[in-house]
Regions:
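Short, P/G- and charge-enriched loop/turn segments at secondary-structure junctions
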Residues: 57-63, 142-143, 222-223
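Cap/insert and terminal regions of metallo-dependent hydrolase folds
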Residues: 98-105, 109, 232, 236-324
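Metal-dependent catalytic neighborhoods of phosphoester/phosphodiester hydrolases
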Residues: 134-144, 303-304
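Active-site glycine- and acidic-residue-rich loops that bind
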Residues: 134-136, 221-233
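Active-site metal-binding loops of divalent metal-dependent hydrolases
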Residues: 27-28, 86-89, 129, 159-160, ...
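Metallo-beta-lactamase
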Residues: 1-116, 120-132, 148-224, 242-248, 272-288
Length: 324
């Protein structure tokens, strides 16, 4: 990701999954992400080979650039209002990532356009504790970071929280999870715990959990998919026989469905991230679940299918999903 797009308004896109309504809340869009920077092991010939299988809204063959974004997913289900990941947030100092540094976006207006105020959110579910997934947990008020979703229970990995707290000097470093994650290539950004999670915990709004697949609310569960971060999770929603998977940073672009071996520059433990990606791709292809991405452009939602020995990604639009 190399350049922030304009902050022009985007209409909310909504999908039906059983009795649940899932709505995208956009934050940022890029149309000129450099694939060589995002995927250090990718060569131009390989991109050209798969470019014909990527849709025009995700890859521009004339420029060789990728389209990406950041967004949240708003879920209305079983009488609850649920927000899955909270994007980057405004005013957050992120000097090591200029495209995320001290943003000023109309995210809250887009949430309002979807018919929800922060006070109406019951649950905030965090797939992992990275800057572009937890930022709107808090807002700057009187020079202090205050929780935005003041009625919501914020649910996240205990291991992720301890790891992030240690990074910011609030706790000793935790033991790694039992699985061997391999060598850490990319440390997480500092200060994310300080400005985006600790204020929530201090306000009594946090709930740290084990990522073990157990249901945490009606039809909602966290499933282990480590590697991109130390205890990264895929969140699954089951409703009336249908499934939605919120895959977060299992993939950063549809290209990785075709090339699951590609590591992103942002993955902390790339070998484990690849193993998790291959596992999620295989399970998603078998289940037929509707997958909701964290950084894909276009609708952000799609299905994974088998493609010879590998996989393919097909975007799903709300009209195509209307019968669900």
């Amino acid at each position: 990701m190399t350049q922030q797009s304009s902050n022009s308004a985007e209409p909310p896109l909504s999908f039906r999954v059983g009795d649940a309504l899932v709505t995208r809340i956009p934050e940022l869009r890029w149309t000129n992400a450099d694939p060589a920077r995002l995927y250090p092991d990718l060569d131009a010939a390989a991109l050209g080979a798969y470019g014909s299988q990527l849709s025009a809204g995700s890859y521009n063959p004339d420029t060789g650039k990728l389209a990406q974004g950041t967004h949240s997913w708003l879920v209305r289900h079983a009488g609850r209002v649920i927000l899955i990941d909270t994007a980057t947030g405004n005013d957050k100092p992120r000097p090591s990532a200029p495209m995320l540094d001290r943003l000023d976006t109309p995210y809250l207006s887009r949430l309002a356009a979807a018919g929800v105020t922060p006070e109406q959110v019951d649950l905030v579910l965090l797939t992992h504790i990275h800057a572009d997934h937890v930022g709107w947990n808090t807002v700057l008020q009187d020079n202090t970071w205050q929780p935005l979703f003041t009625r919501a229970r914020h649910v996240y990995s205990e291991t992720e929280a301890r790891y992030a707290a240690a990074l910011d000097g609030f706790a000793p470093a935790p033991d790694l999870p039992p699985a061997d994650l391999g060598r850490a290539d990319h440390p997480p950004m500092p200060q994310v715990y300080t400005d985006s999670l600790k204020p929530v915990i201090d306000a009594g709004l946090g709930q740290a959990i084990a990522i073990d697949g157990k249901e945490i609310a009606d039809g909602l569960s966290f499933h282990p998919a480590p590697g991109h971060s130390i205890d990264h999770a895929v969140i699954r929603l089951r409703s009336r026989g249908e499934e939605a998977w919120f895959i977060a940073d299992i993939m950063h672009h549809p290209l990785q469905a075709y090339r699951p071996d590609l590591r992103s520059v942002y993955c902390e433990f790339p070998k484990t991230a690849e193993q998790s990606r291959r596992g999620v791709l295989a399970q998603a292809a078998e289940s037929g679940a509707l997958c909701f991405s964290a950084h894909f452009a276009e609708s952000g939602a799609g299905r994974i299918t088998r493609n010879g020995p590998g996989f393919a990604w097909k975007f799903v639009n709300p009209k195509e999903n209307s019968a669900s």
